[in-house]
């Protein structure tokens, strides 16, 4: 029988790894301990940095010499890193499939194997002290050698590992060598939706423990009224006694000695931790060796107790909801090798968008991340490193989850997580992993988690919550979530994944939130996911872009399915995150114009609105004419206050009220007067009366076999009788358009419409519909010339289409009123992306000015974050740089839009009549629709010499159907009868207000 390799033995989780324990550092003095800087802790040596490195084709290719002899000629790499990201071996991305043959627990013999070497000069280890090396992440299997001596082995890629290296060290130079395998038996339960990559990807460092030292501690809080009853359990080695102190930054609130490893105390008028007020006490242990303090161990400790009563979870006795996201570790330059600054920036962005919870999908994080969540106020569904999704491809996702032979591997992963992180106030519940089916090993994990800690346990694929404490679903539709609310489950419920954020989207978050707000039994929701997993790259021509699956020749792959976050790979918020932040804003408002009263509701869970101020802005036709500051005061959670606010409506124009909510306080995540959100209310609309147009010369018409040319005082407009388009339009000697209006039902495909495309549009060729012009005619109508174009727009292969009529009314002023109507024929009446027109204007540097929703990108089911106003930008700045280019730049609720060159000339689009009651949407791109649609990366986008302008009468909502929820019925656009009108006006350098003035032309 063949010998069993350690990396192919699921029953063997480690060799010589130290037992898991709370994460902490020991210091030589109290002053050093007060810094909380691990770099100043006893014997700390940072081993992250430059290492010698060589990649071997497999573990058998690594000789003992390469683990015991320094190889100065090897390459240098900077740890932490993933070697594939640094150009060694092959990057691969799959959502769920294993990139190797399924033969658990075995992996290929040509298993890429990296060997790291580093010389570390160390002083002699003090008598009785122990030298510990700690790895916070090795993927997927690591062996450690010191001075040629085998120290130990670890698995569980995203879990920390410590080894005692004391006996292998010498005074002076020491050779540390680490052998890392890309694949191991652990890879079968580490099949998370992310890049397959490997290496020492988190920090590695040395720590020193004195002869008398703390081994572990456990801190538990029980709330009784305003008091916190605290239980402390400690494990120490060689210590004569252990003394603890708890202080609030100014005063010691509790102190005592842990007798036989146990102590109890109470804190009166305790300041309990919560995500809105994440107060942390300073907990310090003094470990004595005889009469001398051997080490000081500090920990920033929140007072928090999580309890479950019926189907509700409580934090310190208070009900709450989690408005969260699923977060993977990701850095666009380093993959999963995420540094502290990146973690901080993630949490800052979350808090700045009203997010109060994270699910650590689907593995344990760097231990400092939990410390930061305590500090910033982020509640955690703390998930361990486990997913076996790839087995679904062979018909049994629970193949190893329900195999007792794999129990040690499963239990090891939850034990290490809970033991290391259970002192953190931010952790609301533990999660056993993701998408691994259900079976005996989940039950074993649950038992271990509850043996070690009392907080509730979550696991989505325990679909009936037979074992776990929290029932969960993912990607449930709005109607299904409402049904869950109407028929409550006996246990608490969360929606652990929803709102799939692939590319442009998600849409429909407001409707979800209305349901979540309605039902107390639904206690949390988590967007999938936080950040795109794109990796920064540069083409041979020097063009920057972001890679996804398949870009490295990897096959099989899941293409851009990893580009599914609310934050771009470079940590810039997407329009989807901006929308989510507004949807979950805890300052809710309603306005009663008749009563002159603004109702402000506090949807926080723990704190009042005492820190909030409101700025109420009155807008007329999009511009602010009046501001007033309001103070809601100490409105308690869940309560409302009515504030007097009388808005004077304008005699002429559209009057709107926009109320911005700011926090006046400075936080670790924001500066004072940071905006939390805004609400807008329609007050009145009194369109300006049309004024009589000045007398202008009559229009003249020239007709040839192929053209109809209409002359006005300052310009001319030419129609092609061949294809029915505006072939030329000039005003004051300048081109108004480069290509005239064409009716369209398609726009570049967005990821969230992928399932509609696969099930409807692709087979019906909606994206390649053809236009046939049947008739072009004209007539004189008073002072106007009316040109009528009849067309049929239909796909190849199929026998359905749309009979379209475009009626252009050309007026002496140069204005063109366009009425577009359509009647369908055939058997297709399902959804389509849009109903509208597109045209091109010359130049690619156009300024854009509009009155409508803004300033950011918005869509029919995603516009809460963008109130109506008067905005200015450029075409380039409107374009959203999605990693895979797709439809973007839309602005809803548009009353008018002007696109102008640097000379001030251009075109104005509005409705012929009251635009406020009948707005349209528009987008403008420096590319053609075809260019965007065919592009796979931003480097495929090549600018032409025109700007594409899209005017939409109807636009399909975004939804989140890349993997989730289709577009809600109220945001659907169907292939049905339609009719709409727009006015097109040439602009010169004259004032825009003059062009906007309503003019009645006979």
Predicted region positions:
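Intrinsically disordered, low-complexity Pro/Gly/Ser/Thr-rich segments with frequent PxxP/GP/PP motifs
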Residues: 260-269, 622-652
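Beta-strand/loop-rich accessory regions of lumenal/periplasmic or secreted enzymes
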Residues: 84-87, 94, 137, 182, ...
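An acidic-aromatic loop/edge-strand motif
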Residues: 82-85, 90, 97-106, 155-157, ...
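Extended acidic/polar, glycine-enriched regions
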Residues: 167-173, 233-309, 651-703
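Accessory beta-strand-rich segments of carbohydrate-active enzymes
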Residues: 2-8, 12-17, 37-38, 52-56, ...
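Surface beta-strand/loop "capping" patches
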Residues: 211-238, 574-612, 692-706, 820
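Extended substrate-binding grooves/exosites of carbohydrate-active enzymes
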Residues: 1-39, 79, 94, 188, ...
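Glycine/proline-rich low-complexity spacer/linker segments in large multi-domain proteins
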Residues: 2-26, 36-38, 151-152, 175-208, ...
């Amino acid at each position: 029988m063949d010998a069993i390799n350690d990396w192919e033995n699921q029953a063997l989780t480690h060799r010589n790894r130290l037992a898991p324990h709370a994460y902490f550092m020991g210091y030589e003095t109290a002053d050093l301990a007060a810094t909380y800087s691990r770099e100043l802790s006893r014997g700390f040596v940072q081993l992250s940095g430059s290492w010698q490195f060589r990649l071997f084709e497999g573990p058998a290719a690594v000789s003992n010499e390469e683990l015991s002899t320094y190889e100065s000629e090897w390459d240098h790499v900077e740890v932490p890193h993933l070697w594939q990201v640094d150009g060694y071996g092959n990057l691969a991305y799959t959502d769920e499939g294993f990139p190797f043959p399924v033969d658990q627990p075995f992996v290929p013999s040509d298993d890429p194997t990296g060997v790291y070497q580093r010389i570390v000069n160390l002083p002699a280890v003090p008598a009785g002290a122990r030298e510990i090396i700690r790895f916070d992440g090795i993927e997927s299997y690591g062996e450690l050698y010191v001075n040629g001596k085998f120290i130990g082995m670890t698995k569980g890629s995203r879990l920390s590992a410590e080894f005692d290296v004391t006996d292998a060290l010498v005074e002076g130079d020491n050779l540390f060598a680490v052998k890392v395998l890309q694949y191991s038996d652990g890879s079968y339960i580490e099949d998370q939706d992310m890049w397959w990559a490997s290496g020492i990807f988190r920090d590695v460092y040395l720590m020193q423990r004195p002869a008398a030292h703390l081994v572990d501690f456990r801190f538990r809080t029980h709330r009784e009224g305003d008091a916190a009853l605290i239980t402390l359990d400690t494990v120490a080695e060689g210590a004569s006694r252990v003394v603890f102190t708890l202080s609030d930054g100014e005063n010691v609130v509790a102190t005592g000695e842990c007798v036989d490893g146990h102590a109890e105390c109470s804190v009166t008028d305790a300041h309990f931790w919560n995500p809105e007020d994440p107060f942390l006490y300073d907990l310090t242990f003094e470990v004595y060796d005889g009469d001398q303090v051997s080490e000081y161990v500090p920990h920033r400790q929140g007072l928090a107790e999580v309890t479950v009563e019926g189907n509700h979870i409580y934090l310190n006795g208070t009900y709450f909801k989690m408005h969260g996201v699923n977060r993977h570790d990701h850095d666009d330059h380093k993959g999963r090798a995420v540094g502290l600054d990146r973690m901080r920036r993630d949490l800052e962005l979350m808090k700045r968008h009203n997010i109060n919870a994270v699910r650590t999908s689907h593995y344990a994080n760097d231990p400092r991340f939990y410390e930061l969540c305590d500090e910033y106020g982020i509640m955690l569904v703390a998930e361990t490193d486990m997913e076996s999704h790839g087995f679904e491809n062979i018909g049994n996702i629970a193949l190893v989850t329900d195999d007792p032979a794999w129990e040690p591997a499963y239990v090891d992963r939850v034990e290490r997580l809970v033991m290391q992180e259970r002192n953190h106030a931010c952790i609301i519940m533990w999660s056993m992993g993701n998408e691994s089916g259900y079976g005996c090993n989940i039950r074993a994990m649950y038992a271990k988690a509850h043996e070690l800690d009392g907080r509730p346990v979550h696991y989505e694929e325990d679909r009936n919550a037979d074992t776990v404490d929290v029932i969960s679903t993912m990607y449930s539709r709005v109607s299904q979530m409402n049904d869950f609310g109407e028929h409550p489950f006996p246990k608490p419920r969360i929606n652990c994944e929803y709102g799939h954020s692939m590319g442009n989207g998600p849409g429909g978050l407001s409707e979800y939130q209305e349901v979540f707000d309605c039902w107390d039994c639904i206690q949390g929701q988590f967007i999938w996911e936080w950040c795109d997993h794109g990796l920064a790259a540069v083409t041979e021509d020097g063009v920057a872009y972001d890679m996804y699956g398949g870009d490295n020749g990897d096959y099989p792959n899941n293409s851009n399915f990893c580009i599914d976050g609310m934050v771009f790979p470079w940590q810039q918020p997407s329009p989807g995150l901006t929308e989510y932040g507004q949807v979950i804003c805890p300052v809710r408002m309603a306005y009663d114009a008749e009563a002159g009263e603004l109702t402000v509701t506090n949807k926080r869970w723990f704190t009042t609105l005492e820190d909030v101020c409101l700025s109420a802005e009155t807008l007329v036709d999009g511009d602010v004419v009046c501001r007033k500051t309001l103070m809601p005061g100490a409105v308690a959670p869940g309560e409302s206050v009515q504030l007097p606010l009388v808005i004077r409506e304008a005699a002429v124009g559209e009057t709107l009220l926009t109320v911005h909510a700011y926090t006046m306080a400075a936080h670790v995540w924001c500066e004072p007067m940071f905006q939390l959100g805004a609400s807008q209310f329609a007050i009145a609309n009194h369109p300006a009366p049309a004024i009589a147009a000045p007398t202008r010369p009559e229009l003249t018409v020239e007709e040839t076999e192929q053209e109809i040319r209409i002359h006005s005082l300052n310009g001319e407009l030419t129609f092609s009788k061949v294809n029915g388009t505006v072939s030329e339009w000039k005003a004051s000697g300048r081109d108004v358009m480069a290509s005239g209006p064409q009716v369209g039902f398609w726009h570049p495909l967005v990821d969230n419409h992928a399932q509609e495309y696969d099930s409807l549009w692709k087979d019906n060729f909606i994206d390649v519909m053809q236009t046939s012009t049947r008739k072009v005619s004209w007539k004189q109508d008073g002072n106007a010339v009316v040109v009528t174009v009849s067309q049929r727009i239909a796909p190849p292969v199929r026998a359905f289409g749309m009979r379209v009529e475009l009626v252009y009314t050309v007026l002496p002023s140069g204005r063109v009123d366009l009425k577009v109507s359509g009647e369908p024929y055939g058997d297709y009446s399902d959804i389509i992306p849009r109903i509208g027109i597109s045209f091109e204007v010359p130049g690619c540097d156009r300024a854009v000015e509009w009155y409508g929703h803004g300033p950011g990108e918005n869509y029919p089911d995603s516009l809460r974050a963008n109130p109506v106003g008067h905005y200015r930008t450029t075409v380039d700045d409107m374009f959203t740089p999605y990693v895979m280019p797709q439809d973007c730049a839309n602005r809803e609720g548009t009353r008018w839009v002007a696109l102008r060159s640097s000379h001030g000339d251009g075109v104005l689009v509005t409705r012929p009549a009251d635009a406020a009651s009948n707005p349209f949407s528009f987008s403008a791109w420096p590319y053609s629709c075809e260019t965007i649609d065919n592009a796979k990366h931003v480097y495929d986008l090549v600018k032409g010499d025109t700007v594409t302008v899209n005017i939409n009468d109807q636009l399909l909502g975004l939804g989140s159907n890349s993997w989730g929820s289709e577009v809600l019925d109220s945001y659907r656009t169907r292939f049905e009868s339609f009719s709409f009108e727009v006015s097109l006006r040439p602009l010169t350098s004259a004032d825009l207000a003059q062009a906007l003035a309503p003019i009645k032309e006979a």
